[in-house]
Amino acid sequence: MKKTIEVFLRHCYYSKLQELPDRTRPSWFNKHRVFENFKNTLNSELVNYTIVYDEFYGSIDKTFLAQEKNVEIIRCGSECDSFLKTLDIIQSRNFDDDQIIYLLEDDYLHRSGWSEVMLEGFALDSKYVTLYDFDFFINAGFLCETFVTPSSHWRAVPATTNTFACKYKTLLEDLEIHQKYSIDGIKEEELFHFSRDYDKFWELQKNQRYVISPMPGWSTHCDANHISPVIDWNKVMNETNFKNEGKKFTLKY
């Protein structure tokens, strides 16, 4: 059954990016609970999701995702390659032009109602929507246009991370740009490869392909150095109806 939003959620058994010195998790962070939060806050009448799981470092069978049904297995080992493979998977689905595609990384926490808020963002006729209120662009001298929808204020932002939403037609039109900044990603050492997402959205903006984000955010990157402001995300996590609390799973990151 067709749903308005198709989510492609990238997971992996282990990410070497967690070894970088600037990658710090909040004290409340837990990958299993973040996934449960995602499932329990989406509107199932609006959203389908596909897990794109990278088994380069280990099998999905060793994780809390072992019983998930809609899974695409890849073996990449780096953020750049997994993003490029996810783009291939999306293209293979041959969606309608107006299908909303949400490319989501596995360390984003959501507030209830995010599905509806995402649709409000697209009602503003923006090419790209992020639910993450990236604090990098606060008090930084950036001028922006602001908007309002029934549930939120919005602002135009210069860039965002590789978690974003757009329509399928937009993704295809901009595909070469998305590919370029992952093919030519940041490569600090073997498998420490990650996309130049910031640079990518700057180029898209120059082509008048703008991205907007809500204020405050309806999601946050679970990076202790860049949490979406205003919202108590620890409270959001604790309010999640987390099932299987007593089960033990292995996940190496």
Language-model features and meaning:
Residues 1-78, 91-95:
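N-terminal anchoring/stem segment of glycosyltransferases
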Residues 86-100:
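Active-site nucleotide-sugar/metal-binding loop of Leloir-type enzymes
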Residues 109-179:
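Conserved catalytic core of nucleotide-sugar-dependent glycosyltransferases
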Residues 1, 26-27, 168, 173-253:
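C-terminal catalytic/acceptor-binding lobe
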Residues 97-109:
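Short beta-strand-to-loop acidic/aromatic patch adjacent to the donor-nucleotide binding site
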Residues 12-14, 56-59, 79-80, 106-109, ...:
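Short, solvent-exposed loop/turn segments at secondary-structure junctions
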Residues 8, 48-53, 103, 128-131, ...:
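A structural signal for short, well-ordered beta-strand segments and their strand-loop junctions
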Residues 77-85:
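A short, glycine-/small-residue-rich helix N-cap motif at loop->alpha-helix starts
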